[in-house]
Regions:
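Internal, well-ordered alpha/beta segment that forms a basic, Gly-enriched binding/recognition surface
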Residues: 8-19, 50, 58-59
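Flexible, glycine-/basic-rich loop-and-beta segments that form/coincide
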Residues: 103-161
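C-terminal target-recognition/interaction regions appended to catalytic cores
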Residues: 164-261
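Short, conserved secondary-structure transition motifs
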Residues: 94-102
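Conserved Class I SAM-dependent methyltransferase catalytic core
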Residues: 37-94, 109
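Mobile active-site "lid"/loop adjacent to the S-adenosyl-L-methionine
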Residues: 19-39
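Short catalytic/ligand-binding loop motif for oxyanion handling, primarily in non-cytosolic enzymes
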Residues: 16-20, 66-71, 118
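S-adenosyl-L-methionine
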Residues: 1-5
């Protein structure tokens, strides 16, 4: 390939986080990788390789989490500094793995080489569209991470009234615990002042079937002002496991057109 050649890359590279415990037994082989491309996720390594090739256009399938999770976006900074997302559509991994126990959003993304690239603010304000003709923008929502600790915090919290399991995204919440009784490395200490917010997450999990697949890699959404009005209801629902009509209406209003019956 000559530097003067126009290069278009189209593909669906493998992607898998080698540090994940899921199916870890098939990820324990190490291979020599260019130091500029080495990454914990194979799909990320492919994107970085496309940047090294200086492709003019790239049309590729990859997990939506590469874009919407800020930590992933930072890992791919070299790529996003040179490419702009100009079109996309989101599909479910169910298309490829219909018998999988869990589905996640995949984006079919068209990138154009651009010397300005994109930053995370661009992603937060980008209108993502799905194959189901839904459109969403991250900045249309507020998220729970603004108000509570999602990861172990025992070095900072001494007055705990409860313990909660480590939180990640909505898909992780689908399969993880919420409140826990036994301390562990993944325990988040819950102070009294934040207890109702952790109850909110617990109730969110109870109603998680109404959250569509394309929000799977998002943080847990919240309308804080409306939550405060129903704060006692959320505490009660967390304990009783019964969601009253006010809470059900809250979630329907929170998700709007994205509410999945």
């Amino acid at each position: 390939i000559y530097n003067s050649d126009k290069l278009i890359i189209i593909g669906n590279p493998p992607y898998n986080d080698k540090t994940s415990i899921v199916q870890n037994h098939i990820k324990n082989k190490n291979y020599e990788v260019d130091v500029n491309l080495k990454c914990r996720d194979l799909g990320m390594s492919f994107l970085l390789s496309f940047n090294e090739l200086k492709a003019d256009y790239i049309c590729i399938l990859h997990p939506l989490s590469y874009l919407i999770k800020n930590a992933n976006f930072k890992i791919l900074k070299k790529f996003f500094s040179n490419y702009k997302l100009i079109d996309s559509v989101i599909i479910s991994s169910q298309i490829f793995c219909p018998y999988s126990l869990g589905f996640f959003p995949i984006i079919i993304a068209l990138y154009e080489k651009n010397e300005k690239g994109i930053n995370y603010d661009f992603i937060k304000n980008y209108n993502f569209k799905t194959i189901d003709d839904k459109i969403f923008c991250l900045n249309d929502f507020d998220f729970i991470s603004k108000y509570i600790d999602k990861y172990p915090n025992k070095n900072r919290v001494s007055d705990k009234v409860a313990m909660f399991y480590t939180m990640r995204d909505i898909n992780a919440l689908r399969r993880s615990k919420t409140f826990i009784k036994k301390d562990c490395a993944n325990a988040v200490y819950v102070p009294k002042s934040k207890y109702s917010l952790y109850c909110y997450v617990d109730v969110f999990k109870q109603n998680i079937k109404t959250v569509p697949y394309y929000f799977g890699n998002c943080d847990i959404m919240i309308d804080y002002n409306k939550f405060k009005i129903l704060e006692k209801d959320f505490i009660k629902a967390s304990k009783s496991k019964i969601l009253n009509s006010k809470i059900l209406d809250y979630f329907e209003n929170l998700l709007g057109e994205h509410y999945a019956n």
